[in-house]
Amino acid sequence: MRKLKLRSQITVDGFVGGPQGQLDWMTFDMDEKLLSFINELTETSDTILLGRKMTEGFIKYWEHVITQPKSPEYEFAQKMVGMPKVVFSKTVKKIEGQNVRVENGPLVEAVNRLKSQPGKDIVVYGGASFLSSLIENRLIDELNLFVNPVAIGKGMQIFSQRTPLTLIASVGYTSGIVVNTYKPK
């Protein structure tokens, strides 16, 4: 069975967004070692899951980057745009973008159906409420939390209840980001 791997930027005090979803706290000064790690993580996946609320910005950003061949993110952007994306939504039937389809079915059944299909692992990016739902329903097999060197005091969280985790790896980078990889217990 394929694994569902959560990837999220997070603050040292556990927030994935400011009170209104602000992301101005994120560290974008990524060194080559961190970019290489992100590329390695991406190679193990062939499908992206997204919550509807973050999809528009995600698609718009990566589809713009692939028009900029000199961008340091160009190679990664090609992977993001080329990979099939499944967007979970209760309200929208169609979303514009390359390799995008919308899933309106019940979350647990739809995710388990995707996980049972042949292929590489599945990577999931936010938003906060979508990630929280996946965690609460015990659908996540691995968490890659990119801990940014900042505390914001309040904001959006992905953990709404006690969630025991086992640390698999923890690696620090020159940008101050520490990537903690966990498995749910």
Where are these regions (language model features)?
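Enzymes that bind and transform nitrogen-containing heteroaromatic metabolites
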Residues: M1-K185
